[in-house]
Amino acid sequence: MKSLKSTPRSTAKRAAIGFVLAAAALAAAACGHLAMMGSAVERPAAEAFGLGPLVSEKQTYSATLQPVQPLRLRRLQSVPVLITDTQGRPVESAVISVDGGMPEHGHGLPTQPRVTALGSGMYQIEGLRFSMGGWWQLKLAIDASAGADRITFNLSL
């Protein structure tokens, strides 16, 4: 009778050990995947970080983030941004979309910010949230009379 009682326990014990080993293997694989993702992304030099002014990829526009308060973690924020042309004139009637994320972690922004025109080249990015500390990229796609272009801000929070 003892052997009958110990058999189910033994089988259950083996199944539990197998489950733990499988979970450990998955965790190790996930850590290796994250390490590969992090090493595949080259972090920009320190001088590439900041609020601007930055010139767009095609040299069409310049943008400067002008937060009223320092950017903060885990809070919804609104951030004004000044968009000018290469001569420093305000860009009016631009359509601006916001994207971004943490390149070293492989995820995007936790929110979907929207942009509202304020006038005189000023726009308000609303609903911006940074969920954790580290290197973030904030990407603005700007479409105005001079054409479409992109600007990427590197931020350390």
Q: Over which residues does each language-model region extend?
A:
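Intrinsically disordered, low-complexity segments enriched in polar/charged small residues
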Residues: S10, R14, G18-F19, P110-Q112
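Intrinsically disordered, low-complexity terminal tails/loops enriched in metal-binding residues
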Residues: A28-L157
